[in-house]
């Protein structure tokens, strides 16, 4: 686990997820993998991707990791760091829409 959040993680956490009405956790370990943010009630993992995620090794690692998380029923949502920086409000609205939709569909079951 990292003690210090990257600037994009810090902004998403302190400016949106920390006080979001549905609980999110930071740096959640799931089956040996650490996700940036996790919402158990919506079964969503949010990942903020820096440049290392776009190398061949990074892409392969992320694909393997996403498959494992999906096997647990967790939807992985990825945002490139630059999208979070450039379109923060839109990113937050998108996260809200997904969480709301997932919780509604879970409650209907």
Predicted segments with their positions:
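Nucleic-acid endo/exonuclease domains
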Residues: 1-109
């Amino acid at each position: 686990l990292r003690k210090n959040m990257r600037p994009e993680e810090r902004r998403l956490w302190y400016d949106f997820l920390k006080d979001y009405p549905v609980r999110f956790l930071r740096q959640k370990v799931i089956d040996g993998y650490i996700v940036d943010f996790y919402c158990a009630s919506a079964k969503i993992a949010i990942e903020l991707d820096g440049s290392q995620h776009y190398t061949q090794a990074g892409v392969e690692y992320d694909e393997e990791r996403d498959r494992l998380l999906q096997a647990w029923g967790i939807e992985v949502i990825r945002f490139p760091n630059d999208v979070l920086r450039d379109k923060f409000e839109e990113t937050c609205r998108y996260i809200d829409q997904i969480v709301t939709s997932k919780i509604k569909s879970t409650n209907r079951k």
